[in-house]
Amino acid sequence: MARVALVPCNSYDEEKVFAAVQTGVNLMGGISAFVKPDEKILLKPNLLSKALPQRAITTHPAVFSAVARLLREEGYTHISYGDSPGSPTATPQKAAESCGIGEAAQKYGIALADWMGA
């Protein structure tokens, strides 16, 4: 059964985004309804290109940070992130750095799972 929660958030302020994400997850039964603490988690932030957050091409770093923070605060440890950029000149690492996801991932100790180079 699919679960959806719509929670308004009119700002990319990190605390406001975190509160909205946390509210949405709680409305759906909490994070433990979706993943167990010992499972591996891959966050896929839509790293299409090396675009700044203002261009709204990739997931905003405040949203990525909110999900990462929620997982860390709930005790999840096996978390990585990754994607396959649509541009042949954009590596996942370059795209993550350009759009702010790399900094957010580093803040929460989340490693890049680079399957492009494998």
Model-based region annotation:
Residues M1-A118:
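N-terminal and secondary-structure boundary signal
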